[in-house]
Amino acid sequence: MPVRPCIHFTPPEGFMNDPNGLVYSNGKWHLFFQWNPTGNQAGNQHWGHAVSKNLYKWKLLPTALAPGDDHGLMFSGSAVIDKTNSSGFFESGFFSRKSVDPEERIVLIYTTHYDNRETQNIAYSLDGGITFIKYKKNPILDIKESQFRDPKVFWHEESRAWIMVVVLAQKYKVLFYHSLNLRDWVKLSEFGSAGVLGYQYECPDFVRLPIEGTDEFRWVLIVSINPGSSINGGSMVQYFIGDFDGQTFTPIDSASRILDCGHDCYATQTFGNAPDGRVISISWASNWNYTNDVPMRMKHRGMFTIPRELTLCYTHLNQETRGLVLRQRPVNLHHLYYPDSLPAPLLLNRVCEFPTVWTSATVFYLAVSIPKSIVLESPMEFLCLTWSTTPDVETSKEYFELGYRFHDGAVYVERGVCSSSWKYPLYPERCTSSVPPSSYEDNYILEIEAVVDHSIIEVYLQGGIMCLTNAYYFKGDEPLQYYYLRVPTGASLAKSGMQPLLNNRPHS
């Protein structure tokens, strides 16, 4: 039986980690990824490449970047569409024999890693993103540092320039650079030693997001931490909200916020040039604390989250304070619904079977309402939603459980016993956090959306203001195919349903 996820991207074989070079070009979403095609652990880093028209069904393309004669490894980076040919690569002349469609002028900006040095480099495509030519005058940026990597580049319209954010990983600095041609870069400013430091900063991203219900925007700086996460001691992603004047990022407060409170979300990156100004992200769904050791029953290791649309919104942080947070919602899941299928309502206090198994992933959604008076009378009661491989949910060792306490918003996810044949001391089976009810009026309300796929579950609470992404590795190949939903006495389901999703596996 297959254990490859149905709607989560995985490599055809080998080891995959960070998403790289996410960009939209001429109706296609380009996804590049850190890839070791010859081994099942990190190393021998290449850039793999796939394209999609809907962000779920991916077609593999030839390897985009591979180590060259200097043996430098191809580390993480980004991609842009150079519509105005600022680089000079795309008009008939010195670099190109013919003019390239402005919407297909893809430039990759990436780190080359050597044993004692990391530099920033570029490559460009003259065939719409099928093959890439490394710039002969690389590197474009070399500051003689050994931990200088992961450039994210975007066009900043207000200053009419390209902006690069890149980390000095073990000095806890995010550096901002400016360029008019993608080849020559001038330093603007620094941001750093903020939030959770851990061992190092990695994989920055920098995006302008709308604030829901207003005509305002804020800039969000995303920084990954590894190891030393405040969640699990390993990998995590944090973000800072602020303003950007074309030179300097200024946070609105001193808070560091967590992007995903699960154990398996890292190296979050957003698509450049997305239509309609949407901001869509994908993350690596694993953790450096154990990724090189997780069980392999197929030819690959590594998977990505499903795409998420990002916005900012004001929400309750507790009963007295509202604050600005990131909201993440799954993108276009309704496009994956089976034709003419209707969602099956969720049933309470009984073991129920999924509508389909093996062939697809399943999305669960529910909104639970409970009177405030009942919460105050019984503050320690939990809502529990459990998924299991067997109908004997209470004794199963291969299960996944989500729990929520309305009184204080405490939430936990438990991913069961991984495998009697695989144990790893840095693989935690439970994660905990908190998210307030969406209302503190007469009724407390909890909204849940959970995407259940083979080997991974993504949970979105309160419309995506909290996310918990967790992979799971059971001993057998049986899927999660039963669920049990228990709610506190007096609670009611305002809405509920589960919907099977079309299988989008690109390879077996």
From Swiss-Prot:
It catalyses: Hydrolysis of terminal non-reducing beta-D-fructofuranoside residues in beta-D-fructofuranosides. Substrate binds at F15, M16, N17, D18, Q34, F75, S76, R149, D150, E202, W288. This is Putative invertase. SMART domains: Glyco_32 (SM00640). The lineage of its organism: Eukaryota, Fungi, Dikarya, Ascomycota, Taphrinomycotina. GO terms for cellular component: cytoplasm; cytosol; nucleus. The keyword Cytoplasm applies. The active site is at D18. It is found in: Cytoplasm; Nucleus. It comes from Schizosaccharomyces pombe (strain 972 / ATCC 24843). The keyword Cytoplasm applies. Its main location: cytoplasm.
